[in-house]
Amino acid sequence: MSKREAGIRASRRQVLRGTAAVAGAAVFGVPKYARAQSKGKIVIGTWGGDYARLLTKNIEQPLLISKGWEVVQDQAGDPQRRSKMLAEKRLPRGTTDLQGLSALNMYQMHDAGVIDPIDYAKIPNAKNLMPSMKYPYGVGHIYSGKVAVFNEKVLGGAPKSYKDVFDPKHGNKLGIIDIQYQYTLVAAALAAGGSTKNLAPGQKLLLECKKAGARIYPTNEAFAQGLKAEEFGVGIMWKARVVQWQNAGIPVESIAPTEGTLAYVSGLVVPKNAPNKEGSWAYIDAMLEPSAQELFAIDMGYNPTVTNAKVAPDLNKRIGFTPAEIESLVDLDYAYMTENDEALKEWWDKELKG
């Protein structure tokens, strides 16, 4: 069994434990806007920025709005949207039909009891969904992996593993991203011989790196600026973001670590009190259309989650993973991270950053 399969099966064992449709009117003078609502309204909670723009461009406009659905985006950061879902838990009718979340956050909302199981029978395109992206409580939209990133000129070589990245000998040539604390803790644990639920070896290693002079950047963007300025030469980041940085002229390369690459999945969940669940299934089905998946690969550098999407070989070489690397993708232990997140964040802030 691969690391990827073991992670998925383990997380699923933990999971097991634990219409306002408007009638069309062929009447002269009926506004186009009214006719466009003939299938009803779909409200999706999502991040803003490029992701929201590309949802409109690649999914909503060509595959939903053009077919009579009205789509409204409720844009906010995922902490705010998750808080809203929890606050609306007791309401018979919520305010959104879908929410875009990471795989970890999808699990957390499942654990909180605020989302429905996915009815895959109502999603025809799910037949092409990669098994690893078919969660009981959510559907994977796009994925990438937490790879080693480096500037060979600054570093004086190329890493092959997380162990090579989190080597105290790099001193201040190692860059760490503050908001990526969860994935950094797990990657460091793998580097130090720990596991996705044994992070203590990684915490010890990170303290050694800090003592040696590792730089901590507050955000992904600040990390990118540090790379651009050649302030440091090695770290970890999503491969998709690396492609975006390369496109922007930042001198950075990436490699899949030998321990197995930590997977990042962005997907959709359906709140239990979603007002229009038929719209929820329609949106997810459109999201899995090959055309939409292919455009997200081009526009954002993320990998498709369906097997019938076609990505050009040159693009796939930049954003994708080999069959062996896909087989070795490693999931966070969602139950462990949910249970220990508060303590891990406190350690990160007080011990590593303090």
Q: Where do the model's predicted regions map?
A:
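Periplasmic-binding protein-like
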Residues: Y143-S144, K204-C209, Q246-K272
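Early extracytoplasmic/lumenal segment of secretory-pathway proteins
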Residues: S38-S102
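C-terminal segment of classical bacterial N-terminal signal peptides
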Residues: V27-Y33
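Conserved C-terminal helix/tail region of periplasmic/extracytoplasmic solute-binding proteins
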Residues: E325-G354
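N-terminal secretory signal peptides
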Residues: M1-S11, A21-A23, R35
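Extracytoplasmic ligand-binding site segments that recognize negatively charged/polar headgroups
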Residues: G49-T56, P79, G94-E231
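Mature extracytoplasmic/periplasmic domains
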Residues: A36, P271-L329
